[in-house]
């Protein structure tokens, strides 16, 4: 059986990595070993941050809701508790959007939560 050489496979693998590293600065887009490390790290960051993004946005929404509820004389946790008791099922994304774009409607929700807490 003849010896199988890996030149075609290696070249294709190198080409694939260097294509992924296109746009990187310096040797990170030119040299295979450095480019491979940069691409692997980039893919790791992308994977990790797709999950992190969900947590970051939830934190942002909670901070916005908290700021708006405190302007209306209520804390975030008591506001959420009041909404749960009132049976209002609006998610935090929508609450944050209301707090930023429609303060009047958000104020009505705060008053509803206050009435259910009292």
Curated annotation (Swiss-Prot):
UniProt entry keywords in alphabetical sequence: Ribonucleoprotein, Ribosomal protein, RNA-binding, rRNA-binding
Write the protein's name. Answer: Large ribosomal subunit protein bL20
Please name the Gene3D superfamilies in this protein's record: 6.10.160.10, Ribosomal protein L20
Instruction: Cite the SUPFAM superfamilies for this sequence.
Output: Ribosomal protein L20
Q: Does the keyword rRNA-binding apply?
A: yes
The processes (GO biological process) annotated in the record are:
ribosomal large subunit assembly; translation
Keyword Chaperone (UniProt) = no
The record's similarity note reads: Belongs to the bacterial ribosomal protein bL20 family.
GO CC field = ribonucleoprotein complex; ribosome
Native organism? Desulforamulus reducens (strain ATCC BAA-1160 / DSM 100696 / MI-1) (Desulfotomaculum reducens)
Q: List the disulfide bonds.
A: none
Task: Name the domain of life.
Answer: Bacteria
Any Pfam family from its record, for instance, is Ribosomal_L20
Q: What InterPro entries does UniProt report for this protein, alphabetically?
A: Ribosomal_bL20, RIBOSOMAL_L20_CS, Ribosomal_protein_bL20_C
* Protein function: Binds directly to 23S ribosomal RNA and is necessary for the in vitro assembly process of the 50S ribosomal subunit. It is not involved in the protein synthesizing functions of that subunit.
Give the molecular function GO annotations. Answer: rRNA binding; structural constituent of ribosome
